[in-house]
């Protein structure tokens, strides 16, 4: 039996390749709930063996991929099947295989081609107690991220045979360790002139992991601000890097030269993206944009231009921090814990409420445009931010703006407070506070409580909006170094919830 791993979403599972050769008409069959791509492996493996000058005995050969009740898809089983046949031909000794796993697709000429999902499969092999894993050479740096298991990069089936025959050993890859800290990108908040209020709101959002909706006329700097958000977020932890890399590996988007992602993802899909493009999908479900943004940011520019089904599909993942894709063959769940940053114009022409330019839209057009963003989705934005046009004095000023590094220091201090507060729990920041501990971790003064009560009654806020105001106020208090939420902290949090009343219920 020769081991390799399969994939269901991000979850790797062990597959044992069993082989039997018996008397009878020469044949070669693969069983074990294999799909068409796996059954085609017979011809790839046959041709690869022939090209490598390896002859199979004239026998009836049956390959079983166990467990037989789990569907096997893809071409990742080729190398393990070939190794099983090599063992049957006495070209490999059992002692060399008992603690090894094999992953890779074979070409007709015997080359070993790269496959997707090597990192989660290597992690599973290490957890199983295996000491060696053989992967395509193009994937070996990805496998070398995992400690406690030797990763061998194989270029061809012939090279693997020489390795087993000890004619030309394959050297295991050195364990990959990122030599530099997380890269925060070349974009900097110092490039943005003016917009001090918007910068402060985004700093609060970064400090607490809050979702942000920006509304403003064209050219006010919404996209420019959003693209600089990763530069003020805290550096990724190693665990976050592994989670993020796993997702990109399964999606086939991992750069072979950068096997471990250390930069927070920034995904910005076009407004024509389909619901499946956002959530993930396909006959073999792959991660969508919301999962690719895991541990990072999802930026939706021109929010009102997205289709209603695409926007509504965000609602549940924003609450659950995971998305489940169901197919006839089963369900797959991907994580999607991300910050949502959205930007939109206030009307079709973009100039409703502009201080100098006249809006040419009718009230009905404005109302119809804004109604594309539903109330339930609007409720899931913690911070509503109006981005005003930049003043000429700010544009022409030669004064230096505050850098992202300086802002990031304050954000990190607030996150350190939160890390201490939520130590030993699955909560990572204030935006993730669950309702059962909300009042415990968000104590308020009597004055703050009265203000919150007045605001709740006067504005007719939903229970979700109330919770989000309290969470934002908790972040503002953390940035202020306060243990108890005061009136001024509530006032700032309420200020960040005013635009839904101005534009949607005005």
Where are these regions (language model features)?
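Walker A/P-loop
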Residues: 214-255
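Short beta-strand elements
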Residues: 15-21, 278, 382-385
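Conserved alpha-helical scaffold flanking the Walker A/P-loop in AAA+ ATPase domains
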Residues: 203, 260, 265, 275-298, ...
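Walker B catalytic acidic pair
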Residues: 295, 301-302, 313
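Catalytic P-loop NTPase motifs of RecA-like helicase/translocase cores
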Residues: 109, 300-307, 350
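Conserved inter-motif catalytic segment of the P-loop NTP-binding fold
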Residues: 240-274, 281-282, 388, 428-436, ...
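Peripheral, non-AAA+ core regions of ATP-driven protein-machinery
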Residues: 3-213, 220-223, 261, 326, ...
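Basic, amphipathic alpha-helical bundle interface domains used for macromolecular binding and assembly
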Residues: 31-42, 57, 64-74, 284-285, ...
């Amino acid at each position: 039996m020769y081991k390799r791993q399969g994939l269901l979403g991000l979850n790797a599972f062990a597959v044992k390749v069993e082989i039997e050769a018996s008397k009878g008409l020469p044949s070669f069959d693969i069983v074990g709930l294999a799909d068409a791509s796996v059954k085609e492996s017979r011809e790839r493996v046959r041709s690869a063996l022939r090209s490598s000058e390896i002859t199979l005995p004239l026998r009836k050969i049956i390959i079983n991929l166990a467990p037989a009740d789990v569907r096997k898809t893809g071409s990742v089983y080729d190398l393990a099947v070939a190794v099983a046949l090599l063992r049957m031909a006495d070209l490999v000794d059992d002692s060399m295989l008992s603690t090894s796993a094999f992953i890779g697709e074979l070409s007709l000429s015997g080359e070993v081609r790269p496959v997707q999902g090597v990192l989660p499969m290597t992690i599973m092999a290490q957890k199983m107690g295996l000491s060696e894993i053989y992967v395509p050479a193009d994937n070996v740096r990805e496998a070398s991220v995992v400690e406690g298991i030797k990763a061998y990069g194989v270029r061809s089936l012939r090279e693997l045979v020489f390795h087993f025959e000890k004619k030309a050993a394959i050297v295991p890859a050195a364990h990959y360790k990122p030599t530099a800290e997380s890269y925060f990108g070349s974009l900097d908040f110092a490039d943005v002139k003016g917009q001090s209020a918007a910068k402060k709101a985004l700093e609060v959002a970064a400090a607490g992991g809050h979702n942000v909706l920006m509304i403003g006329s064209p050219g006010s700097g919404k996209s420019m601000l959003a693209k600089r958000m990763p530069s003020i977020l805290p550096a990724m932890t190693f665990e976050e890097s592994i989670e993020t890399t796993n997702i990109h590996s399964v999606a086939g988007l991992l750069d072979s030269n950068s096997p471990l992602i250390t930069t927070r993802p920034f995904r910005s899909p076009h407004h024509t993206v389909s619901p499946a493009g956002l959530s993930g999908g396909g006959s073999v479900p792959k991660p969508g944009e919301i999962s690719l943004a895991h541990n990072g940011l999802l930026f939706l520019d021109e929010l009102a231009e997205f289709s209603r089904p695409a926007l509504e599909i965000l609602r549940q993942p924003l609450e659950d921090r995971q998305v489940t894709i169901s197919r006839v063959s089963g369900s797959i769940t991907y994580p999607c814990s991300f910050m949502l940053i959205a930007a939109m114009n206030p009307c079709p022409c973009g100039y409703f409420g502009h201080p100098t330019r006249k809006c040419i839209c009718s009230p009905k057009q404005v109302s119809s445009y804004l109604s594309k963003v539903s109330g339930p989705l609007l409720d899931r934005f913690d911070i509503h931010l109006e981005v005003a046009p930049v003043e000429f004095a700010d544009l022409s000023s030669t004064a230096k703006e505050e850098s992202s590094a300086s802002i990031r220091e304050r954000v990190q201090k607030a996150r350190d407070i939160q890390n201490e507060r939520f130590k030993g729990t699955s909560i990572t920041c204030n935006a993730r506070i669950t309702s059962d501990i909300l009042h415990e971790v968000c104590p308020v003064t009597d004055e703050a409580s009265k203000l919150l009560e007045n605001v709740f009654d006067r504005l007719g806020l939903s229970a979700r909006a109330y919770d989000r105001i309290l969470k934002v106020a908790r972040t503002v208090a953390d940035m202020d170094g306060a243990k108890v939420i005061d009136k001024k902290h509530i006032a700032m949090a309420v200020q960040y919830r005013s635009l839904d009343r101005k534009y949607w219920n005005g």
